[in-house]
């Protein structure tokens, strides 16, 4: 895993867009994002049990597996959105980028590779893309039945209860 501020320059979303400003694991924790490197599947199973993840599936994002819909899917994943549930991804192969919003609403890019696991809290704005190899194989873990409802960023979604709880927990300044 490597995390850094996104450079904001135009160009292919699958390129690194590395600003040269690193972000560490503690910075990610401060916005509710958990990172683990778990080379053994048993460790993933233990984490799933401890956090109450009852269901899982696997997805391979690549032109070979998705065919003609690959480009449109990658564009859809890259639209800024949130979920009303935690998003848990364990990378089984390939590489991908999760971009998450910092406390200052800047993009933080997190490069994930094989054996990396990332947990995004409900309500955090984020987006995803493969890297320039156009291949990632990931396990998705869920607390309940698998669902993937993306709510794209906008004024209505800013007022969503899960978003408001996230803001209160991770972004609001402490009362003086």
Swiss-Prot record:
Pathway the protein acts in: Amino-acid biosynthesis; L-methionine biosynthesis via salvage pathway; L-methionine from S-methyl-5-thio-alpha-D-ribose 1-phosphate: step 5/6
Family matches, as InterPro entries: ARD, ARD_euk, RmlC-like_jellyroll, RmlC_Cupin_sf
Localization, UniProt: Cytoplasm; Nucleus
UniProt-annotated binding residues for Ni(2+): 81, 83, 87, 126
GO cellular component, one term: nucleus
SUPFAM superfamilies: RmlC-like cupins
Cofactor needs: Fe(2+); Ni(2+)
Primary residence: cytoplasm
EC code: 1.13.11.54, 1.13.11.53
Stored Gene3D superfamilies: Jelly Rolls
GO function terms (MF aspect): acireductone dioxygenase (Ni2+-requiring) activity; acireductone dioxygenase [iron(II)-requiring] activity; iron ion binding; nickel cation binding
Catalytic reaction list: 1,2-dihydroxy-5-(methylsulfanyl)pent-1-en-3-one + O2 = 4-methylsulfanyl-2-oxobutanoate + formate + 2 H(+); 1,2-dihydroxy-5-(methylsulfanyl)pent-1-en-3-one + O2 = 3-(methylsulfanyl)propanoate + CO + formate + 2 H(+)
GO terms under biological process: L-methionine salvage from methylthioadenosine
Keywords: Amino-acid biosynthesis, Cytoplasm, Dioxygenase, Iron, Metal-binding, Methionine biosynthesis, Nickel, Nucleus, Oxidoreductase
Cofactor note: Binds either 1 Fe or Ni cation per monomer. Iron-binding promotes an acireductone dioxygenase reaction producing 2-keto-4-methylthiobutyrate, while nickel-binding promotes an acireductone dioxygenase reaction producing 3-(methylsulfanyl)propanoate.
Binding annotation for Fe(2+): 81, 83, 87, 126
HAMAP family noted in UniProt: Salvage_MtnD_euk
Similarity comment: Belongs to the acireductone dioxygenase (ARD) family.
PANTHER family given in the database record: ACIREDUCTONE DIOXYGENASE (PTHR23418:SF0)
Known function: Catalyzes 2 different reactions between oxygen and the acireductone 1,2-dihydroxy-3-keto-5-methylthiopentene (DHK-MTPene) depending upon the metal bound in the active site. Fe-containing acireductone dioxygenase (Fe-ARD) produces formate and 2-keto-4-methylthiobutyrate (KMTB), the alpha-ketoacid precursor of methionine in the methionine recycle pathway. Ni-containing acireductone dioxygenase (Ni-ARD) produces methylthiopropionate, carbon monoxide and formate, and does not lie on the methionine recycle pathway.
Name of the protein this chain belongs to: Acireductone dioxygenase
Organism: Fusarium vanettenii (strain ATCC MYA-4622 / CBS 123669 / FGSC 9596 / NRRL 45880 / 77-13-4)
């Amino acid at each position: 895993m490597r995390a850094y501020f996104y450079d904001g320059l135009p160009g292919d979303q699958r390129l690194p867009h590395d600003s040269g400003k690193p972000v560490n694991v503690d910075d990610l924790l401060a916005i509710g994002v958990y990172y683990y490197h778990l080379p053994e599947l048993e460790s993933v199973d233990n984490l799933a049990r401890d956090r109450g993840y009852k269901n899982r599936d696997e997805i391979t994002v690549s032109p070979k597996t998705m065919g003609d819909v690959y480009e449109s899917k990658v564009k859809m994943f890259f639209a800024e959105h949130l979920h009303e549930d935690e998003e848990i991804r364990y990378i089984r192969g390939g590489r991908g980028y999760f971009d998450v919003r910092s406390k200052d609403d800047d993009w933080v890019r997190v490069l994930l590779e094989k054996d990396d696991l990332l947990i995004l809290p409900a309500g955090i704005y984020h987006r995803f893309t493969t890297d320039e190899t156009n291949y990632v194989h990931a396990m998705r873990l869920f607390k309940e039945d698998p669902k993937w409802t993306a709510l794209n960023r906008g004024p209505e979604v800013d007022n969503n209860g899960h978003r408001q709880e996230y803001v209160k927990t991770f972004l609001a300044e402490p009362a003086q």
